[in-house]
Structures are given as structure tokens and as C-alpha cells.
Amino acid sequence: NPEENEKSIMEFIQANRDIRGIAVMNSRGYIIADILRKKGINDIIIISFDLTSNNTRCIKNGSITALLCQRPELQGFNAIKEMIQHLIYKQEGKGNHYTMPIDIVMQENLPYYK
């Protein structure tokens, strides 16, 4: 419920006036960013995940400072590649541990991302 979200967020901000940053651990950072922007609060840094259209809009208007992007296309590609290697070529996979790059997207480097 958007009204309840706004009420809860503003109660939290008012109870924690010294807060300087918020880390949103999912792709919905735009919800908090939009509320703070609507209320004229622009001195809180917001970091969130994923380059969604709403988060991209907030990066562009400065209400989100940074996004951590996990390259879902590459994750999917690597999963399919491992499955093909195992099912068709009978090769052992790398196990259950894979390292993946994480991009930090900000206003300055946003144009380099789709």
C-alpha cells in the first residue's frame, strides 16, 4: 500500500533525523527515493539493486545515488551453458560456487548500460 509505505518511511526518517544513507537490499529503491523526493528530502544517500526502469529514472534525477547490478543476462547464460555442458557433453560443472561481476551504476556511468 503506497500510503502505508510513505507513512512508515516518514516515521522512520523523523525518528532517525541523523540518518545519512539507506541501503535497499532489493530492486525497489525507487519507492523510498520517490517518497523522499516528494517530501523534498535530498540529503540522504540511497543505494539499491538492479537497473530497472524505475531505478534508472531515479538515478537520472539524482534521488538514487548508486545501483548494484548483478548482470542477470550473464547469470542466465552461464546457467544454460553449464546445463548444456553437463547434459550434452557429460562434463562436470564447476560445482556450486561461481563468481560473478557486480557493476556499480551511477549517473556518470549510466549511459554505458542499456
What are these regions (language model features)?
Residues N1-S53:
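Hydrophobic alpha-helical
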Residues S27, N54, L74-N78:
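Conserved active-site and cofactor/substrate-binding residues in soluble primary-metabolism enzymes
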Residues I41, N61-G62, T99:
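Short, well-ordered coil/turn elements that cap or connect secondary structure elements
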Residues T52-K60:
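Flexible loop/hinge segments that line or gate small-molecule binding clefts
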Residues N61-E73:
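Short beta-strand elements at the ligand-binding edges of bilobed clamshell
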Residues R71-K114:
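Hinge/cleft segment of the Venus flytrap/periplasmic-binding protein
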